[in-house]
């Protein structure tokens, strides 16, 4: 019997017919030693990763083991479904296809044309969009390129934009700049002004947003977040945009899966353009989508002439040729697979469970005396404010990492340091994909609480962050506490199934 590594290499070839199977056998038999010409060179490209690059294979297996034995709580991460990973690792990686379906700059694109059109159709279907009123570009490489392409299409250089401030839960691509530096390319190429949370409620301050917009007169307002646990009032933001004659762009990268499942409100009723990633709550491969309105925008009251939206050509041109070259056809296919899944009843059940698990996690944290920004959650994440506990997110993140719990430090409203921010962001999507339920998340909070208490104890004995990190590794008693907690976390985590390939 062939070894597993060889079976894995041959398996996909068995669909290609007898000639391919014979060729593969010849490469490993006596015929391989007597062949002449091209075939005698021996290389076929059919060698497995484990045979060709054992070092990389070992690293992949280590990462797979890390994911299986740990608790993944980073809100922007999820576990991609196996079917999408198969598309991602397919022959589509080989095909170059600059341009759009039917208008390529390369030949041999008839199949990838069908794949891209299928992805477009599924994207519109997933969000119940009328093709006469909405279009979608599925070529952006990820969320940040999608946002920059949308800005390029909608704005002129140095036009004004408004987005939620990064320390208040916004994203870098929404125009972030510090007091001394324009950090994001968005703030370099455009003039940005942040809107913020109400420090008392932890909610977006829509009144202040409106006041700022009236003074700043932005051309674009971005409704999107990366660390905000509540729902966005898209209708209110539409009112502000209409008042100041601005476009409304909804960045639903974090919540698009929840929107597709119809478990939270959709931005499409109010937005002009909607962008998203595809690997977070959509549970697909890493890529980006840009949705845009099309059809009739308004009717001229004097002439009665219909005035159409002009987003389609501008957005398509911004993606290609302005910012990208050939699309990643393997990623587009993988996204199409995930979008098909997003239309199923099973995906809606998953999304509902994400919300239940996030609320269970929030309630368990509150019961243990933790402070949450905004006091709770309406979506897939919670933002814990550790400052009342006397700890910061950087120290908590490191302790949890050492016990196989992966979370990320995050700024809270009022934070002055991104190195030692006061918050810890926790998300439910990834562990929900491993079939965690509410009681499981309460157990996860027990582990987190143990880790935070270890962090508090070590902080009392150290000064600087680097001293804190060194003490965790060098103090025998602390190391023992960490090892015990890590053992229990890993034992708990390994009992749950993992999507994707079994070995890597």
Swiss-Prot record:
EC numbers, comma separated: 2.1.2.1
Keyword line: Acetylation, Cytoplasm, Membrane, Mitochondrion, Mitochondrion inner membrane, Mitochondrion nucleoid, Nucleus, One-carbon metabolism, Phosphoprotein, Pyridoxal phosphate, Transferase, Transit peptide
Pfam families: SHMT
Function of the molecule: Catalyzes the cleavage of serine to glycine accompanied with the production of 5,10-methylenetetrahydrofolate, an essential intermediate for purine biosynthesis. Serine provides the major source of folate one-carbon in cells by catalyzing the transfer of one carbon from serine to tetrahydrofolate. Contributes to the de novo mitochondrial thymidylate biosynthesis pathway via its role in glycine and tetrahydrofolate metabolism: thymidylate biosynthesis is required to prevent uracil accumulation in mtDNA.
In-chain residues carrying the UniProt-annotated modification N6-acetyllysine: 103, 181, 196, 356, 464, 469, 474
Subcellular location as annotated: Mitochondrion; Mitochondrion matrix, Mitochondrion nucleoid; Mitochondrion inner membrane; Cytoplasm
Name of the molecule in the record: Serine hydroxymethyltransferase, mitochondrial
Residues recorded with modification N6-(pyridoxal phosphate)lysine: 280
Family of the protein in this entry: Belongs to the SHMT family.
Compositionally skewed regions (Polar residues) per UniProt: 32-49
Molecular function GO terms recorded: chromatin binding; glycine hydroxymethyltransferase activity; pyridoxal phosphate binding
């Amino acid at each position: 019997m062939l070894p597993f590594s060889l079976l894995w290499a041959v398996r996909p070839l068995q669909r290609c017919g007898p000639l391919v199977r014979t060729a593969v056998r010849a490469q490993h038999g006596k015929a391989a030693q007597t062949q002449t010409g091209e075939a005698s060179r021996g290389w076929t490209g059919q060698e497995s990763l484990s045979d060709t690059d054992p070092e990389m294979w070992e690293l992949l297996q280590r990462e797979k083991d890390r994911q299986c034995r740990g608790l993944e709580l980073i809100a922007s991460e999820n576990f991609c479904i196996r079917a999408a990973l198969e598309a991602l690792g397919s022959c589509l990686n080989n095909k170059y296809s600059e341009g759009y379906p039917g208008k390529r700059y390369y030949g041999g694109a008839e199949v990838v044309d069908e794949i891209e059109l299928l992805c477009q159709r599924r994207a519109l279907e997933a969000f119940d969009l009328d093709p006469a009123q909405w279009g979608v570009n599925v070529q952006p490489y990820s969320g940040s390129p999608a946002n920059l392409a949308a800005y390029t299409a909608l704005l002129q250089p140095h036009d004004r934009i408004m987005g939620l401030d990064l320390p208040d839960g916004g994203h870098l691509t929404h125009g972030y700049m510090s007091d001394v530096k324009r950090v994001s390319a968005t703030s370099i190429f455009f003039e940005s002004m942040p809107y913020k949370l109400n420090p008392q409620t932890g909610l977006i301050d829509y009144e202040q947003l409106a006041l700022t917009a009236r003074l700043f007169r932005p051309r674009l307002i971005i409704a999107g977040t990366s660390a905000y646990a509540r729902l966005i009032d898209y209708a209110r933001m539409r009112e502000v945009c209409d008042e100041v004659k601005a476009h409304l762009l909804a960045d639903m990268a974090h919540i698009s899966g929840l929107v597709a499942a119809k478990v939270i409100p959709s931005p499409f009723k109010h937005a002009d353009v909607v962008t998203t990633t595809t690997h977070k709550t959509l549970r697909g491969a890493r890529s980006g989508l840009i949705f845009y309105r099309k059809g009739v925008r308004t009717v001229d009251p004097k002439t009665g002439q219909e005035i159409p939206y002009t987003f389609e050509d501008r957005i398509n041109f911004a993606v290609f040729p302005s910012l990208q070259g050939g699309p990643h056809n393997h990623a587009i296919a993988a996204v199409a697979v995930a979008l098909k899944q997003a239309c199923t009843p099973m995906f809606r059940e998953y999304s509902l469970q994400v919300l239940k698990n996030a609320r269970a996690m929030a309630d368990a944290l509150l019961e243990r005396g933790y402070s949450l920004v905004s006091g709770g959650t309406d979506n897939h994440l919670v933002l814990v404010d550790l400052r009342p506990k006397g700890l910061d997110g950087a120290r908590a993140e490191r302790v949890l990492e050492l016990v196989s719990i992966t979370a990320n430090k995050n700024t809270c409203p009022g934070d002055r340091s991104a190195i030692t921010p006061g918050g810890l962001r926790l998300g439910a999507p990834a562990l929900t994909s491993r079939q965690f339920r509410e009681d499981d998340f309460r157990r996860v909070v027990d582990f987190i609480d143990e880790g935070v208490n270890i962090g508090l104890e070590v902080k009392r004995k150290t000064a600087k962050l680097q001293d804190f990190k060194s003490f965790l590794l060098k103090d025998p008693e602390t190391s023992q506490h960490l090892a015990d907690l890590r053992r229990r976390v890993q034992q708990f985590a390994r009992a749950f199934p993992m999507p994707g390939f079994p070995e890597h």
